[in-house]
Swiss-Prot record:
This is Probable phosphomannomutase. SUPFAM superfamilies: HAD-like. Its main location: cytoplasm. InterPro entries: HAD-like_sf, HAD-SF_hydro_IIB, HAD_sf, PMM, PMM_cap. Pathway: Nucleotide-sugar biosynthesis; GDP-alpha-D-mannose biosynthesis; alpha-D-mannose 1-phosphate from D-fructose 6-phosphate: step 2/2.
Amino acid sequence: MTSPASSRTILVFDVDGTLTAARQTITPEMREFLIEARKRVPLAIVGGSDFKKITEQLADHDKDLLLSLFDYTFSENGLYGFKGTEPYPVQSIQKAIGDAKLQELINFALRYMSDIQLPVKRGNFVEFRNGMINLSPIGRSCSQEERMQFVEFDKKHGIRQKFTEQLREKFGQYGLQFAIGGQISVDVFPTGWDKTFCLQYLVPDFDTIHFFGDKTAPGGNDHEIFADERTVGHTVEGPEDTRKHVENVLKELD
């Protein structure tokens, strides 16, 4: 049974690297753990991916199942979200900065990525979402093996870090933010449209907001919400570590 203290507390989770291994589906054990935890405290997710990808990862492509697992569901950093099954207004990067600036950004990104030498390149280098643009030097259609190869290459050569710095230098004056997202990409979104965007929907109803994420260092797409004064931030190193952190928080609520 939810106690008065826990009813004013909510646990908010990143998806990739937090509830699942990167771009993998949630395990049955982790899903069951969340179901049991939700009996004691409200739960929310905030992912950078679009709603379709998050539904695939957490609920076997079943939208109704996904919305039944969490009290709040936020994709694209909260720019496409739900309270229960009720949708919030959808935000649009296209309306926010205009097509002319978007095209200038995309053209620059494609030219820049065309000059990067990687072990392999595949397809889907630019993904246009409601509230952001996702840029992937290797291409999002890479296989899991190719993805992991890029991860190691990126660690050694700082491919995404350099890309982010170039984007920030050239387009920062357009009111855009740039963050290293997931394992293979860079997220581009209007200033303030990072994961803290979802907090506007949570702060009125909760006194304590715990956030769990893996990309919490500066430049990572979990950093802003992790460091926000309105949250209690937890850095995790994968689903099993997330579970341990949650168990510790639940003990404190007892």
